[in-house]
């Protein structure tokens, strides 16, 4: 299946690839590592209540984040469909190729029809292949930034997510695409 994926995607220009995925965060994000003086324990506080999860949906292209949204709670099929139709499709261009995993919320006739009408190709990642999806690295950096910012309210978390997105550089994105085996010519 992984070979079939590469045979479908190999002729698509890397500039036309858009990777989409969801990630979840909550109010209990804290740093995982700390420093202290020799012989002393590093201390910090961690909230006992995590609160509701905040789902982030994002679409990443070589030129940056194409569309994103934060939702309090889990993402279901209707929420995902609304994101694709209202946020993603207006930002797409003819000849673009959207790539996402095989999650059941990604499969809907309305979603596929909206992408077809926009002149966009849809390719599903093979099962168990997050290594082919550069947005996984994007979410990793966003979550690490959120850990260091330590937002403890939903309003602060929303601002922290915006700040974490702005911390991602074009160099980061280029490197994530290259790491996921999408050939990029040097600048």
Could you say what each language-model-derived stretch is?
Residues 1-85, 181-182:
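Extended, low-complexity cationic-aromatic segments
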Residues 14-17, 135-187:
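C-terminal anion-handling pockets and recognition modules
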Residues 16, 96-97, 121:
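The start of beta-strands in P-loop NTPase/AAA+ ATPase cores
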Residues 19-21, 58, 84, 101, ...:
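Mobile genetic element proteins and their domesticated derivatives, centered on retroelements
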Residues 26-28, 106-108, 131-134, 185:
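Short catalytic/ligand-binding loop motif for oxyanion handling, primarily in non-cytosolic enzymes
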Residues 29-45, 110-126, 145:
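A short alpha/beta connector and helix-capping loop motif
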Residues 79-97:
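Short, basic/hydrophobic alpha-helical segments
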Residues 100-102, 109, 123-147, 155:
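RNase H-like two-metal-ion nuclease catalytic core shared by retroviral integrases
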């Amino acid at each position: 299946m992984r070979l079939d994926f590469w045979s479908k995607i190999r002729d698509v220009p890397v500039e036309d690839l858009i990777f989409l995925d969801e990630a979840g965060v909550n109010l209990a994000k804290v740093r995982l590592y700390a420093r202290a003086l020799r012989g002393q324990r590093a201390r910090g506080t961690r909230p006992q209540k995590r609160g509701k999860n905040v789902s982030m949906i994002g679409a990443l292209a070589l030129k940056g984040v194409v569309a994103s949204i934060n939702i309090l709670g889990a993402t279901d099929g209707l929420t995902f469909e609304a994101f694709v139709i209202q946020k993603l499709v207006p930002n797409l261009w003819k000849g673009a190729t959207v790539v996402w995993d095989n999650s059941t919320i990604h499969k809907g006739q309305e979603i596929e029809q909206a992408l077809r009408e926009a002149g966009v190709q849809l390719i599903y990642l093979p099962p168990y292949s997050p290594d082919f999806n550069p947005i996984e690295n994007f979410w990793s950096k966003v979550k690490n930034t959120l850990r260091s910012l330590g937002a403890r309210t939903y309003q602060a978390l929303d601002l922290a997510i915006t700040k974490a997105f702005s911390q991602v550089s074009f160099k980061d994105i280029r490197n994530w695409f290259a790491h996921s085996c999408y050939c990029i010519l040097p600048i």
